[in-house]
Amino acid sequence: MIIKRSITIKKHSTSISLETPFWVSLNEIASSRKISLASLVSEIDERRSTEPKLGLSSAVRIFILEYYKN
């Protein structure tokens, strides 16, 4: 199931659509790093600036896969 959530990053509200396992993983990563979900997504958003055509939801999925791969 795909879940759409609104997150505020850089004082701007944006929507992210992810499958449930990705939301669970994203929350686990934020919790383990002791930061908010919005802070983590903001970090991911800053990293994707090198690939501007990459959507934020895709960037989040790639971040999660790379996080667990390492």
Regions found by a protein language model. Give the residues of each.
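Short Lys/Arg-rich basic patches
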Residues: 1-17
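Short amphipathic alpha-helix starts
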Residues: 14-23, 35-37
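Amphipathic alpha-helical interface segments used for dimerization/assembly
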Residues: 30, 41, 64-68
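C-terminal structural segments of small proteins and small subunits
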Residues: 51-70
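Surface-exposed, Lys/Arg-rich phosphate-binding patches that contact polyanionic backbones
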Residues: 21-33, 43-50
